[in-house]
Structures are given as structure tokens and as C-alpha cells.
Amino acid sequence: VAKTNEKLHQVENKIKFINIDIDKYKSSNYDLIISNPPYINCIELNRLDDDIKLHEPKIALSGGFDGFRDIRKVIAVSKKLLKLNGKLIIEIGHKQKILSVKILKENGYYINKISKDLSGKDRCIISTKL
């Protein structure tokens, strides 16, 4: 989808896509990091519909005991990787807005916007590193 949009908006020479685990980044000074980390907690993971459990790898779903393991990691590591005023866009679970905003603010981020998904649930936080 990202590559299609890159061509559609004719920005092939202005964007560099990097698809890698956040722990493996070696350089810093990025303008933008977009992350969709696993954010489902252990209890909710066991309650997921079979069609989700059977078609999605557990590693793509499980956010640890409280669902925030990878959210915390992405926020902390992004703080080191982003340049000043760089943007972090992160997807969250619909009940994770309050704690996610708290973690972001504790790590020096300004909250620009919280977007909702198609069912009206909080789903994505756009923030700026201060």
C-alpha cells in the first residue's frame, strides 16, 4: 500500500521505506516513524475469534501481559531515532488511548491528533518529538 501511494503521489525520490524490527535500527535522525505494534493483551488474545487466531501469527498480535510491551518499546526507541520535531504515528488498541498518551508525554512527545477507526474507536496517535 505504501509503495502504491508513493507512486500515486509521485514522491519516489523523496521517500525511503525501511521495513525492519525497531531494535535493529542503527542510525537515527528520522523525520517519521510509523508503527503498528502488537497490542493485544494476554486475556484478549485468548478470546479472539478463531478466524483471527488461525490466520495471524501470534507474534503479530501479542502485546504481552498488559498489551503495552511493544507500544512502550516503540515509543522509547523512537525517541532516540527521531530528529527534533519528528513524527511518531502509532496504532493502538481501542482501550489504550489514556495510557499510550501518558507514555508518550512521559517520553517527551506532543500529541497532535488521535484518529478513530471506521467503528469510531480510538486507533492511531500522531505525535511529535519535542
Regions found by a protein language model. Give the residues of each.
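S-adenosylmethionine
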Residues: 1-130
